[in-house]
């Protein structure tokens, strides 16, 4: 640690030139987590931040949709706003299977409802519904889980559980695991498979990597960053932090992270908790890459990660 902040190590030799180009400006940012939190707690500035994020992603997602050959429409399921993403040319037969996505963004911003779904719908041919769940600070836990559950229950009404998969990145991964323990608590059948990509199952304690890996969140850990989401709930409540509960009976899971992901430790700790519960897990750790790097489709490493995600769901989700 220097007087100017964390010392940034050189890139791993295996990291592509494209990934280096993406990561370099991120590492040069001067994060101001306290200011960010203040902006999100004010209704006017919060609206502006969310609008700016949407405007930034709009042209990128338009290009992604063209590249992966998908159509995107909006709708509602069980009263919950959603986006439907499906590969062009698919017929009603494709609807026998469904993937449900929960976007990232710290439970405060939509940073991935299309970046996380367009590639998977295009690669697998399985329609994807991304849930536009209620976000903090307006809506705290368990509002997002309630919305996720409502969409899942509707999916069960139209197809068997073996034809459904769920997944998410970052906050969406947190929500994925929270939904699974909620499904178990409600006595509902489990989906065929779940993807937990760069997330956390523990909102009470920070992981080791959060202490030293560079992040646009600055020095804030996952428990600190998600404080507004957790208001009013004991941090070790198993429905909020699933690693403190009984994880037996959960479906096969793919876990994904990278060695410069601030949530590397949290993903590994979730993997250990799932293994202790005899859940079939596949943990993929990618060398030298940043948090949720699969969102940057210009990186060769992303092609590898997306192929792993798509292959996992293709193997486990059957009509």
Describe the role of every protein-language-model region.
Residues 22, 26-30, 35, 39, ...:
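Alpha/beta-hydrolase superfamily serine-hydrolase fold, recognizing
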């Amino acid at each position: 640690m220097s007087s100017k902040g964390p010392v940034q190590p050189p890139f791993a030799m295996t990291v592509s030139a494209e990934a280096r180009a993406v990561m370099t400006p991120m590492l040069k940012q001067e994060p101001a987590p306290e200011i960010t939190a203040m902006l999100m707690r004010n209704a006017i500035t919060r609206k502006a931040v969310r609008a700016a994020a949407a405007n930034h992603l709009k042209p990128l997602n338009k290009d992604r949709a063209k590249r992966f050959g998908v159509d995107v429409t909006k709708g509602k399921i069980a009263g919950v706003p959603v986006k439907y993403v499906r590969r062009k040319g698919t017929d009603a037969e494709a609807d026998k299977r469904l993937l449900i996505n929960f976007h990232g963004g710290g439970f405060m911003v939509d940073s991935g409802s299309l970046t996380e779904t367009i590639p998977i719908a295009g690669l697998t041919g399985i329609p994807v519904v991304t849930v536009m769940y209620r976000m903090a600070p307006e809506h705290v836990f368990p509002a997002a889980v309630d919305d996720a559950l409502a969409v899942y229950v509707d999916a069960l009404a139209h197809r068997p559980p073996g034809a459904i998969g769920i997944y998410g990145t970052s906050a969406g991964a947190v929500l994925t695991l929270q939904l699974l323990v909620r499904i178990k608590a409600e006595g509902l059948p489990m989906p065929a498979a779940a993807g937990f990509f760069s997330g956390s199952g523990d909102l009470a304690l920070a992981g080791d990597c959060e202490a030293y890996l560079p992040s646009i969140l600055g020095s804030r850990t996952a428990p600190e960053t998600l404080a507004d989401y957790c208001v009013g709930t004991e941090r070790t409540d198993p429905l909020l932090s699933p690693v403190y509960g009984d994880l037996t009976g959960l479906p096969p899971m793919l876990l994904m992270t990278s060695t410069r992901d601030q949530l590397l430790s949290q993903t590994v700790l979730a993997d250990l908790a799932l293994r202790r519960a005899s859940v079939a897990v596949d943990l993929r750790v990618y060398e030298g890459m940043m948090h949720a790097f699969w969102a940057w489709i210009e990186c060769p490493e992303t092609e590898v990660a997306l192929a792993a995600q798509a292959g996992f769901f293709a193997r486990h989700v059957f009509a």
